[in-house]
Amino acid sequence: MVLTQQENLSVLVGQRFVCLLGKDLQVDPDTVSKWPWKSGIVRAASHKDLHCPEIKIFVEYDDESWENRTWLELYGPTVKMFLVEHNLVLADHASPSNPSVSVQCPAMVYKVLVGKFSLGSTACLQFLGEKDKVFLSKELVKPVRDRETLKQFMQDNKTFNKAFQELIRKSVDESRLLQAARNIISMPINVYSMDPSMQWFSGTITNVRTASRALEIKCEQLPSLKIIDPALLHVVLVHNYGDQNDKSKKPRASKRKSQDTESEDQTEVKQTRNEEVPSKDVTQKTSFLTYRRDDGKTLVVVDNPKATTNNLFNYMTPATEDQQKVQQSLSSKQSVPVGFGETLLGCAATTPGIQNAATPPPANSPPSFGAATPQGKGSQNLPGDTTVLNGDANREETNLFLSAAASQGNKRSMGFGIMESPSTFSSLSTMPSWSGQPNSENGLKSENLFAAFTKSSTVFPKGFEFSVKSFPEQKMLSVTDSPKTALQKTCVPQQEQNVIRKPENNHTSVKAIKPQEPPYTKSPNKTDGVTYPKSILLNPQKLKRLQQSGDCFVQDGSCNNIAPHLHKCRECRLDRFGRSREQRDSAVFCRFFHFRRLHFNKHGMLKEGGFLTPNKYDAEAINLWLPLASSVVDLDLDTAKYILANIGDHFCKLVMSEKEVMSSTDPSKQVAWKRAVRGVREMCDACDTTIFNLHWVCPKCGFGVCVDCYRMRKKSLSSGEEGNEMFSWLKCMKGQLHEPENLMPTQIVPGKALYDVCDIVHSVRGRWGIKSNCSCSNKHMRPVSKPVVKEEVKPSTPEPEPIKSLLAQPNVCTVPDPPAIPNKPPTPACSSPLSWLTNFPQTIVNKENKDNLFASTSKSEHKPLPSFASFGKPVSALQTFGSSILTPTTSNNSGFLRNLLNASTLKQETSDKSTPKILDDIFASLVQSRPLSDFDRKPQGLPIQPSLMGFNTPHYWLCDNRLLCLQDPNNKSNWNVFRECWKQGQPVMVSGVHNNLNSELWRPESFRREFGDQEADLVNCRTNDIITGATVGDFWDGFEDIPGRLKNDTGESMVLKLKDWPPGEDFRDTMLSRFEDLMNNIPLPEYTRREGKLNLAARLPTYFVRPDLGPKMYNAYGLITPEDRKYGTTNLHLDVSDAANVMVYVGIPKGEHDQDQEVLRTIQDGDADELTIKRFIEFKEKPGALWHIYAAKDTEKIRQFLKKVAEEEGHENPPDHDPIHDQSWYLDNILRKRLLQEHGVQGWAIVQFLGDAVFIPAGAPHQVHNLYSCIKVAEDFVSPEHVKHCFCLTQEFRYLSHTHTNHEDKLQVKNVIYHAVKDSIAILKANESSLGKL
């Protein structure tokens, strides 16, 4: 485990540095320590990109007044050396307790950022707790890899403790600010002032912009400052932990007291007290502090918790009273709340008395500290130190994070991070943190710091957990339902449309604040109306029967309401840290809801009774997963066959992988069944991937991990590489690690429905003659081998007749056969008009294509720039190879060539069904890459050929006959022609869409009029800098007026992009009229509409969380000048889903001359073909954007090429970052030529004109360069042809860092595949009676 200050050195602001300055400085390389080093801290920066040669930083120097601060040109001639703090290491140092002895001490090592002199083998270090920098040999510096290395040193050194705590606080706060986490909304901050008269000014965060990572603030000292970027200006969070500024009260000593319980293996509890007596005339407010970690996880701790009058070990409560309170709690209204950050503190239950306890008053004033605030002198309580409490004699001895268990006789539950049994670091369970005394700089106290090292981590401060140990005048912690103060309000960020069970990585958290209006209102939640039957415990007769019989029943409410004294799931423990009562009472958040079984013991106490098993489903649960034609909407027979033919093999692979995992589980472990919950997306707590079926769950807290994360963890443990995993695992209730062997295998699909559906798929494909190339051993109607489901009995509820018939499949209990190696498909017996092509040697085709690829490229590199006059030639008919080979050989217009070939081979045996697939591949090779003659290269106009592909489908070909362009967006046959190219992974363009749109809705004036006052994130396309303090109106004012654009520091008009606007909300909710206008006129509605029959996302039942597929707007100025050709409006990237991007408006700005000539040169430089140029010159169409799209199969070649270029330029390639997913590259003409020459990768150069819709396949890398100012709208969809790319990309995105927007799996590809197949076979089975008539 290496403890790193940050994930990377991407941000300098707030970091400490060591530098060497002087233009003519001369140094002795042998005396590095005697060089005139200067140290300090970076307060501001001019650019985010550290590699920008013009970057300047604003610094303060140590041992100098802050007024002597200055700007430094980082890569200028004055800066000879510049080192910044990097990570924590160990090095030899004199022992603090015995200077004559040398020990391994922790130190911060500095990394060279600018080095014009060589340090050789010398490293710069700063030992924690010391100010001086030292220079040691790198051989003496060791990384912190062992948890035990700091244990003894931490116990003995108070100075180190304080410095280490400060390091943790600083890193966590920086991470929260730089990531613009929503849990910092309403928090007070100190912002560094550039005004020479003051160093800091204070403010409050009113909102965050997660896309640009900017903060919206309110500052009374500087009202004009509304938006700041913490990556450019130093910002410090101000924590309100209690009364720390009241100088009239002196700190008193504190006392640690241990008490033993009646249980022999009770963990020793150490309690820390703070004796300050708060004023009685101040109203107390309970607040909840949240910390955002570098890995995106959220920690929640309690500030000023409520006190209790109950004795610490007063566990016993009459059963009748307990049941009465449970019934009262269950009567609350249910609602679906917003997701919150996960609490990593172990949480034991509290007695009802504790929940109703009074609340002591708060501290008088919050602290104010920042990077430059001197350290306080508050006292600290170190392990082993015993102090005397000089307080009120009547006060109780309490531990703030100790909570009594409500279960009768359960005296071992200590809660809140206190280990239930002695552990490796049990002696340090009360390790102090930032002192709560008035003079202390920090107010937070931490639990055992070594518990932080028990969690797998690769980056500091991942794995570090925080809790509060002591506050002024606080008694035992009471976690209550909600703050009872009448004036107190809760600021709740806007809810998502559905609940996502991923609390650790959710940006939302709740923090009690002073009475004020929330920064933005909460939108209604679609699942607010979801209701569940009342708990069985509310029925007196049923409750009595259950108590007498001891029968098990399913938990039908949240843990807090049903079983507060039993193990609580992670969500219910978080519920007690700040949700309103209505939110807490919602059972939908509980991970044990309809999952865990309970029963009453002989004493009438509620106990755990295990979990549901796969055979315990009911009709409602199983119907969601079975192919029932009555539940299928908007799916016809032909479409069902097409979908099954395209994704049936992927479904089989999905089932085979599930079977493989199931067969590898421990036979002695019972598989649990977790039923799907409406409006909840089950996600892996480690990698954020949506969980489809099999996963592993902790029976104590509900922590769940996917199959891949489980395997990775087991592999790392078995190989002894613990701590090196890509994904860290959260800890269990009381700080214990989650061990793989303690997790239980769990499935979501009930019973054997998954394997039954797989049987039906093979049966249906055989009956309907649908081609299949899956590797299943039961490919030809053989029953699938189903894993054994233990305790297989009849379901308790009767099944409907359709279910019984569908599930009436033989159950063969065998291990799945290994995947069969498919043999080469035999040649069909009959011959078709082009049957000779089936034996055409594809290797020759590929070789010929490759040879001519370079030949055609070399010829096109030196094409002269055509003039306007050169395009005045007469228009003649365009005859392309694509049109001739795809024209049917007969006069029958009913279908094109592939339909003809399919019809000729349909009567053959099953072995003959591979012919169309072979022809598809050959057509793809021939159409994409055949040698181009001079005739093909010559532009011959843009004719409309009504019968070109067997349909009345007007179209033509671009990109040297490699790009299909459909000319009539309303043609009903478009989708038949479209899918022939689409299935080959080619992009497609549809022109003329703007003729159907309401142009008034898409004009810049309409947007300026409706939304001009909204604040927005503007991006400088030339520098990628974020422009703060701007409005939507500022952007639209310069859309078609260059002099009216915002200017940079040098007075030059900026090329801006309006990023992620409208933000957050559904496009339909924000711009309903535009949404309807687009959806009513978007081409190929079978694919692009939300309910399109070929949009597989529409197959996902409303029971599930639907993926957000748009529409999304992309608005940006044009990059016109020759220097702008190296910049991209949108850099090279790829998307997990297919997309249709429509150019709805092109604005030609005023104020510049010869724009047409510059645009023409840019189009020519972008490798556009002559037909494209003809559209611009002769037909006077408005070009909007230049696209470069590459085939998905070439992604890895492009990735390796960009990594090689990055290494050549001296850039790093971190393992959790990706040159394509990072969107950090734009391939200009030089790079595109290198890519073609070195890797043979050629893309499609497409100019998108007004009204053009560009269809981009999933997984296809693409980039965009705006020629003029553009308004584009994109709609995503999931097509059957590209599901395989969606699935592969989901796996890729797992390995991205948590800061990537694509890291989270929002598409749910496995769920989409399953339900699309399920609906398809339901339609096919319902129409089996018509088979004889075909």
Curated annotation (Swiss-Prot):
SMART domains, A to Z: JmjC
One Pfam family in the UniProt entry: DUF7030
Nucleus in keyword set: yes
GO molecular function: chromatin DNA binding; histone H3K9 demethylase activity; histone H3K9me/H3K9me2 demethylase activity; transcription coregulator activity; zinc ion binding
First and last residues of each zinc finger (C6-type): 684-709
Enzyme type, top EC level: oxidoreductase
Protein name: Lysine-specific demethylase 3A-B
Organism of provenance: Xenopus laevis
Name of the encoding gene: kdm3a-b
